[in-house]
């Protein structure tokens, strides 16, 4: 959750009025609230007919002494929420935003169920157990004949804390058994500087030193196992390896990290486990690239987490963590509960949690099956490659992510090479395994020619078209580079890729036109901007030409002729 500071309404409103008065006195006008004629700018305004029910204004920052009719409250909330972005067009988020009618019914019909109450909801508890088994099987715990165990969580952030705690407790037990201190110098955990904040939270919240492996262009902005192994010592409780970086979608190399740790153990006798942060990748990679070995097939991987509400295709609030066997989940972390009607075992950071998202995950697994998830995953990857290629063909952008890169020849099989030779480039096995994420930035040539254009302006201009595309700095040691990022999720079709690309190129060229326009020299008066006159003269012609160019670029990246893009106009 985002932390929110308590707002003292009277104090804030007083300061706001004083600020407006002071700020606007320099401009010679009255405060905004006075111009609007608002006597109570700190109050919510209800429907004009609501005064028949009300005895006082509706407070924003404190509980009103009187309520209001349900319809009025509903209208007030929905009107405020209308200013939120459209979840489907929120390309910043990895979180799934749409389920079908029957999933919605399951969510609605089971919204009152508490997952912790297993005695009251035995069928729900059974479904939870089945999900743990299904995930363990998907991640090949069965292949290793392991007695896997796990639990549902509210998401990967909680799952990461649980996995980290298990590794810390096992490290402490080992230190005690060896007669060594577990307090000085204390435990450490290793992760890339590209780690999502939940991984850093574990270290800070549970007093573990976070050793951040520097990342840069040479490491593809993810953790390099060779750099990570240099930070390992006897106090390392484990290594977080990320299957799908938040920044670029790139997978970290689980197999290579395990190999180096095997060598380290052979030399020192110190056994250091791996936890795979598969928040996104653990429910994408098994379907998109099942030949990729990253899971429990690697003996050093002791636990894996994932978010069902990402590529598991459920609404937010669904996550899981699985341990390869019971010995990697210390008994002292598991609580035995006797006050819910039966004996229950729990390992979580909170007690109550909604059952509905977990039931929706079960429905999604049943409804899609492996084939359905694979079909969606392949479509997501194809659309991500389409967008990435189009961006690079535009000559304005360089794509940092790797979803569209062919594998290094040394990593290709004979079949892969044969497919590449005959031009069968739609096979995902030919490409570098990665999430369907497109991270990109201005090319060096573009920056040289248009030095005053800020990349952040693209984010703001796209928002005018309702697209939510973040512009952010890369991790420490690479923070001088900013990237824009698009996450391709289910429902983001090829047509939507075309529409996004069209808008992106148009706003880019809009900024280019503004950059080229020369302002009048001092002493020439307040003449009009050159580009404004040009736009008035042939605006329709320029827009038509621009859209045609966009269509040609996208079609070229897709291997087809130019196609009509009539949907770009208003219906």
Model regions and ranges:
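Structured loops at beta-to-helix junctions and adjacent beta-edge loops in soluble globular domains
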Residues: 80, 94, 192-194, 242, ...
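Secondary-structure capping and boundary motifs in well-ordered enzyme cores
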Residues: 123, 152-159, 191, 195, ...
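Active-site C-terminal subdomain of aminotransferase-like
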Residues: 286-436, 440-446
């Amino acid at each position: 959750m985002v932390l929110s500071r308590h707002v003292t309404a009277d104090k804030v409103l007083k300061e706001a009025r004083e600020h407006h008065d002071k700020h606007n006195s320099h401009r010679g006008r009255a405060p905004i609230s006075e111009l609007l004629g608002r006597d109570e700018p700190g109050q919510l305004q209800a429907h004009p007919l609501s005064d028949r029910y009300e005895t006082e204004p509706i407070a924003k920052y404190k509980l009103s002494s009187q309520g209001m009719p349900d319809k009025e409250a509903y209208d007030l909330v929905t009107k405020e929420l209308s200013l939120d972005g459209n979840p489907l067009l929120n390309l910043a988020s990895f979180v799934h935003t749409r389920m079908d009618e029957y999933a919605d019914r399951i969510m609605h019909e089971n919204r009152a169920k508490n997952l912790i109450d297993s005695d009251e909801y035995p069928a729900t508890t059974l479904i939870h157990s089945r999900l743990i088994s299904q995930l363990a099987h998907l991640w090949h715990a069965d292949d290793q004949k392991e007695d896997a165990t796990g639990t549902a969580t509210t998401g990967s952030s909680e799952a990461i804390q649980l996995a980290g705690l298990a590794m810390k407790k096992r490290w402490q037990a080992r230190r005690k058994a060896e007669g060594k201190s577990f307090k000085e110098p204390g435990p450490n955990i290793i992760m890339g500087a590209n780690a999502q904040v939940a991984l850093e939270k574990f270290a800070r919240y549970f007093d573990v030193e976070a050793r951040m492996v520097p990342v840069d262009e040479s490491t593809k902005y993810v953790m390099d196992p060779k750099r990570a192994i240099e930070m390992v010592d006897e106090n390392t409780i484990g290594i977080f390896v990320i299957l799908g970086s938040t920044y670029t979608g790139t997978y970290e190399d689980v197999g290579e990290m395990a190999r180096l740790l095997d060598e380290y153990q052979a030399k020192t006798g110190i056994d250091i486990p791996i936890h795979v942060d598969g928040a996104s990748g653990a429910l994408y990679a098994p379907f998109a690239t099942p030949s990729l070995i990253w899971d429990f097939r690697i003996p050093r991987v002791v636990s894996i987490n994932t978010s069902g509400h990402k590529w598991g295709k459920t609404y937010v609030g669904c996550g899981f963590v699985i341990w390869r066997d019971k010995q990697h989940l210390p008994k002292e972390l598991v609580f035995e509960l006797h006050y819910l009607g039966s004996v229950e075992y729990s390992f979580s950071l909170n007690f109550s949690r909604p059952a509905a998202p977990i039931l929706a995950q079960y429905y999604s697994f049943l409804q899609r099956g492996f084939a359905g998830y694979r079909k969606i995953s392949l479509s997501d990857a194809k659309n991500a490659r389409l967008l990435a290629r189009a961006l690079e063909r535009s000559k304005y952008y360089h794509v940092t992510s790797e979803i569209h890169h062919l594998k290094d020849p040394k990593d290709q099989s004979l079949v892969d090479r044969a497919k590449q030779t005959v031009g069968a480039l739609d096979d995902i096995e030919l490409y570098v395994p990665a999430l369907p994420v497109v991270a990109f930035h201005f090319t060096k040539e573009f920056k040289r020619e248009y030095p005053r254009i800020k990349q952040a302006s693209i984010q703001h201009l796209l928002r005018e078209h309702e697209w939510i595309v973040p512009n952010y700095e890369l991790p420490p040691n690479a923070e001088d580079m900013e990237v824009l990022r698009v996450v391709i999720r289910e429902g983001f079709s090829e047509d939507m890729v075309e529409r996004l690309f069209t808008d992106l190129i148009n706003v880019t060229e809009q900024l280019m036109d503004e950059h080229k326009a020369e302002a009048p020299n001092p002493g020439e008066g307040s003449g009009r901007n050159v580009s404004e006159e040009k736009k008035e003269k042939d605006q329709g012609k320029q827009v038509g030409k621009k859209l045609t160019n966009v269509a040609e670029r996208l079609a070229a990246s897709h291997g087809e002729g130019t196609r009509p893009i009539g949907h770009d106009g208003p219906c």
